[in-house]
């Protein structure tokens, strides 16, 4: 049993820069929460709705890819490569 697909993968962008990578089961509420403490233009849903496991793996991989392309720096609002 794979677990249910209820998790969205997303990026927050400011201009053409990715400032945060995350996952959520409620994009609408999550976007409102992010607006309280982050400066970004839009929330972009990435790919298809996933299982939590699949989304978590994507999140770590996506942040690592970002870091590889940005001298080891995480996106502005990600504290570490696990998206926390």
For each feature predicted by the language model, list its residue ranges.
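Structure-specific nucleic-acid interaction/processing domains
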Residues: 3-84
């Amino acid at each position: 049993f794979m677990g249910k697909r209820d998790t969205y993968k997303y990026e927050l962008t400011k201009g053409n820069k990715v400032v945060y990578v995350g996952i959520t089961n409620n994009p609408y509420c999550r976007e409102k929460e992010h607006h309280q403490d982050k400066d970004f233009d839009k929330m972009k849903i990435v790919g298809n709705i996933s299982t939590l496991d699949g989304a978590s793996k994507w999140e770590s991989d996506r942040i690592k890819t970002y870091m590889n392309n940005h001298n080891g720096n995480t996106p502005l609002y990600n504290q570490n490569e696990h998206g926390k």
